[in-house]
Amino acid sequence: MSRKASEDVEYTLRSLSSLMGERRRRQPEPGAPGGERSLLAAESAASLQGAELERAARRQFQRDETPAFVYAAAAFSALGGFLFGYDTGVVSGAMLLLRRQMRLGAMWQELLVSGAVGAAAVAALAGGALNGALGRRSAILLASALCTVGSAVLAAAANKETLLAGRLVVGLGIGIASMTVPVYIAEVSPPNLRGRLVTINTLFITGGQFFASVVDGAFSYLQKDGWRYMLGLAAIPAVIQFLGFLFLPESPRWLIQKGQTQKARRILSQMRGNQTIDEEYDSIRNSIEEEEKEATAAGPIICRMLSYPPTRRALVVGCGLQMFQQLSGINTIMYYSATILQMSGVEDDRLAIWLASITAFTNFIFTLVGVWLVEKVGRRKLTFGSLAGTTVALIILALGFLLSAQVSPRVTFRPTTPSDQNTTCTGYSYCNECMLDPDCGFCYKINGSAVIDSSCVPVNKASTTEAAWGRCDNETKFKAEGAHWAYSFCPTPYSWTALVGLVLYLVFFAPGMGPMPWTVNSEIYPLWARSTGNACSAGINWIFNVLVSLTFLHTAEYLTYYGAFFLYAGFAAVGLLFVYGCLPETKGKKLEEIESLFDHRLCSCGAADSDEGRYIEYIRVKGSNYHLSDNDASDVE
């Protein structure tokens, strides 16, 4: 500690001692009402040891003294979140160009969208063993290298098979990053900033999604090679992260676990600036020693986690949060935002892409709100409020699609079906019925605001941009004749309701349910189980991500568009009950203290918020424990 810092601490100690002495002089006489307790409080304060006073003073003095190095480490780490957001968001706009140029059918579109997600799920499940063996830093370097290679393959792809290979490589990279980055940030951050810095990762995810939507819009005017720029630009942040991590240190906790104690002390001291690290270092080392004693039993870590009640409960909470994040429909919204807007009646592809960027921007801005709220409101309240608002927004979105369905245009023109064609499409009477069949499209003309000469006909199997036969079987011809072709949407005056619903959804989702599952999972596991716990929860996130993204179009087909969003609202409501009953508050607690929150049965751990405002709750007075009042605690602190 510097000379100036030492003088400041000594001054703070003198001030605190004076304050304690003044408090003792102000105590009532023993015979006065409350005198017995006041005397005991005075004796309690007098019995505090100098070391306790010094720790209290250092906490007060050092609270805001965090080196810029910690923020730099968090920022370079969070570039993994940016890649996560960019690579999962950019495919939405790129697909509109790819399906035209490479004439992709529905199956190949689904493969390219979900291929990266599936690979990420596999990588996330294996990532626990990977970053436990190689270290957090090496795992992040590997992730950024994979993203760089995958992006280059995508930019140079000449066919759909190469595109799929590139998406798989990118998926492996973002899967490793998805569960390693939050752990690294949590382990290098001081307790008072941990939640905020981990939330920065989610801020970068949403920033990546917003940037991807802007890139999609900008390059949507390049019909031939625009998708190459969209998919290839992800290599730039991947290279920056790789170069940055060549100069960043390994996690001190991982180094201590591997026996590299001197290096760990040096790095921990560098990351804590003017703060003394002895207490934190001893706490980490002691927890590791205890965990290593418990780990002497044979068997995989996941088996030990499941057999040990506190970690089993933590795993249920962590995986449950990730599951409900996906079941509430977030990646349906993000992957299919342009498609959802088209479903609501937006005809032009470019307009749908630019409108989708509004939703991505909303997600980004309100994630910033979450960064500000996480250490003020706490994890539990923020998650609960976010999920409650998300449920309401999904209901509003569903009602908007229901309203559009109620005014769906009728089929007024039934062309003669060629003898070799299926007649299923021509049998539908309304546009919304036609749209729910993936083999059909809606051909129509517009007179003022009225839809006229409308028919439901089979879609061209080689391209969804035109019909298999009839007036709309040639895009150039039907546009010249004033006709319109709609696939997966119906013309409606209520298309604005979908945009409002999407924006409202992200206003509520982004501050809480977006970052909190990752933040909570980075905190709730003991060190010996942290990598495996985060790998399992990230894997659950990706698995349900795949399930929801692969089934959305089929769900909309069988349940209707509004039925699909009512279903997601139901899942979100169940998640609300889960958060209320099972999620404890971890705000302001050391990572080594959080395990005790799961000592009790699962659905009582979130029954009440913790009193995190007091550092000293009990002191020893003449051989017995005395509970300090709030005022006592504030005086000591």
From Swiss-Prot:
Subcellular location: Cell membrane
Catalysed transformations (reactions): myo-inositol(out) + H(+)(out) = myo-inositol(in) + H(+)(in)
CDD domains: MFS_HMIT_like (cd17360)
Name by which UniProt lists this protein: Proton myo-inositol cotransporter
Residue ranges that the UniProt entry lists as topological domain Cytoplasmic: 1-65, 136-137, 189-201, 250-313, 374-382, 519-538, 584-637
GO MF, one annotated term: ATPase binding
Role, per record: H(+)-myo-inositol cotransporter. Can also transport related stereoisomers.
PROSITE patterns for the chain: MFS, SUGAR_TRANSPORT_1, SUGAR_TRANSPORT_2
Membrane topology (UniProt): Multi-pass membrane protein
Record's keyword annotation contains Transcription regulation: no
Transmembrane spans: 66-86, 115-135, 138-158, 168-188, 202-222, 229-249, 314-334, 353-373, 383-403, 498-518, 539-559, 563-583
InterPro entries from the UniProt entry: MFS_dom, MFS_sugar_transport-like, MFS_trans_sf, Myo-inositol_Transporter, Sugar/inositol_transpt, Sugar_transporter_CS
Family (UniProt): Belongs to the major facilitator superfamily. Sugar transporter (TC 2.A.1.1) family.
Disulfide bonds listed in the record: none
Region annotation Disordered: where it falls in the sequence: 15-38
A GO term from the CC aspect: cell body
Phosphoserine: residues carrying this PTM: S6, S44, S47, S629, S634
